[in-house]
């Protein structure tokens, strides 16, 4: 171990220490080793001899002044000093063949100056709180009496014991830190001097370039017990590092990148901490103090230790600034509440969850008083800024997401100011989300926004029925959200009971269909029809549906069923067979319209209709065929002689000898972008088109129980025949193919109900190539 005798400024050392060092010098000049009798590293000798007053072997001929200085105050330190001297003696004896007596004397003197200064500093700091001595002598950042105990005597004294100067550049400081950290990583116990980086300059240093990757890994190596007091980290990058039991007092961390940096058990008092806007993930502070430290308004303080604030003045920053207290921490505020300041300081929904609101709220609940006081100061600042409603509007959601929750609801000042803000926020939610689905609620929304909406509906019960679309969505997400609390669910259930008792709602729930069939909701299963939406146009009309159905219709997939609900008029269930879903949603339940239309645009069956029935030649038929796809049942029938003849005129040219003509087949491939597709993919598409035309020919659309348009039946069978030619493997079996074919034509005594054929083919397609079916089959038929 290399020992450096850093220069000691004698003007600042207590007189007793000066005399002690002078005495040691004299003894080393005269050969200190000759006066050491026997030193044993025992636990009892020193304290026992002090108690009995007897002479101890450890109390050799050191001057009485040394004993007088240490005995009444820190006997343990004296013991370690004497042991160190013994180690020097032993080492010198081992190396005396190669080192002259004069050099030995110089080395002893240099080491004793350094060692006694360190021990004295350790004693002063622990006993009196005195500041570290100059010349590189310091103590551990956690103020614990561990510095001297961690010091290891030298193994092989070096001749280079002259004072070493501090690093002269950030690169040199970085090199020195790298060396110390790697030694610590290797298991070496560093002295306080080794870990002393006070007044260091790390400006513009990217620590990931000077330290091994293991220090940037999750649960990786830790920089532990270092003293960075009064150091400069401006424009440095300390991202992903973990500093434990470190001291940063009076340091400058201005524009420092500290993404995901962890500070634990550390002293960060009086620090200028303004980390860079390029910091992607907030640093964390675990059991760390930040007294009088200036913090940005976008910090996470969940692990900070707060103390009583002192009377210190706010910090001074370039350009000036306003500040509020959060316990003993300083939070920076904008000079003026401009539009940009409102967005930057208050809108965490627009700034990756970061705002001064979230910073204050990130403190644990044990600091509720400090949190409320800081929020009140913030509200006073906002009130003093005389902000208009238009200026506050973009941040209303952020404001209520924090201030409408405890402990801030306990403050009359905050509640009074927030009341109008929350009312405007609720009105905007009603206007926006009654007719469209709410965004998929994440953890933030479930825990911070849904409770506010419940509270707003509780205050304004009339909105439950006037904005039934929004209210049912709020209850739905409260009851199904995995991050909603039990308290939120209980309040939602209680509020829904009030809704069901409303005169506009109660007539629809006593029909043996609702909830648990007796007029009460059954929240134990998502299959129960617990939700009842009122028509936005007709108070006599309502929709009853289950939790699962409501969820899927608000956030549909290609397989979503759009008819799995009860349509009620005056409380009675009515058939939806001849009701167009798109018209029902547009007129009565617009909350589903956008989602339905979005799914409908992905269905491409209409392209084949446009190929066969061009609007120029067959405009009326084109409209009839497309309109029929918007409902499950059609009142238009095409089985009269004129209609049958007209359809034959259109379809017969496409089916020479009962098969698709090559030209028409190529038109189909082109329309569905299948020219270069595999035969199997072509076959799957033709199969699904056949299913749709089978539905056209059935009694549900253009046929009846006893008759159906032959042209449509023949065209459906031709599409299926071509699919079989391309890929028989997509069919259940050759027998099933033959059965379907016979049913289309009534051959071999087969039952000719094309409705049965359409249903059977549709079930097969949904099982084996559902994505193709979902891209073709009209939603109303799905």
From Swiss-Prot:
Main location: secreted
Segments of skewed composition (Low complexity): 157-171
Region (Disordered): 137-171
Transferase is among the record's keywords: yes
Transferase among keywords: yes
A GO MF label: ubiquitin-protein transferase activity
Residues at the catalytic site: 753 (glycyl thioester intermediate)
Coiled-coil region list: none
EC numbers, comma separated: 2.3.2.26
Reactions it catalyzes: S-ubiquitinyl-[E2 ubiquitin-conjugating enzyme]-L-cysteine + [acceptor protein]-L-lysine = [E2 ubiquitin-conjugating enzyme]-L-cysteine + N(6)-ubiquitinyl-[acceptor protein]-L-lysine
Gene Ontology terms: biological process: protein ubiquitination
Location within or outside the cell: Secreted; Host cell
Family annotation (Pfam families): SopA, SopA_C
GO CC terms, sorted: extracellular region; host cell
Keywords attached to this entry: Secreted, Transferase, Ubl conjugation, Ubl conjugation pathway, Virulence
Family: Belongs to the SopA E3 ligase family.
Its job: Effector proteins function to alter host cell physiology and promote bacterial survival in host tissues. This protein is an E3 ubiquitin ligase that interferes with host's ubiquitination pathway. For instance, prevents host innate immune response by ubiquitinating and thus sending to degradation host E3 ubiquitin ligases TRIM56 and TRIM65. Required for inducing polymorphonuclear leukocytes migration across the intestinal epithelium. Preferentially uses host UBE2D1 (UBCH5A), UBE2D2 (UBCH5B) and UBE2L3 (UBCH7) as E2 ubiquitin-conjugating enzymes.
Additional comment: Requires SpaK/InvB as a chaperone for its stability and for secretion.
SUBUNIT field: Interacts with SpaK/InvB.
Name the UniProt record assigns to this protein: E3 ubiquitin-protein ligase SopA
Organism this protein belongs to: Salmonella typhimurium (strain LT2 / SGSC1412 / ATCC 700720)
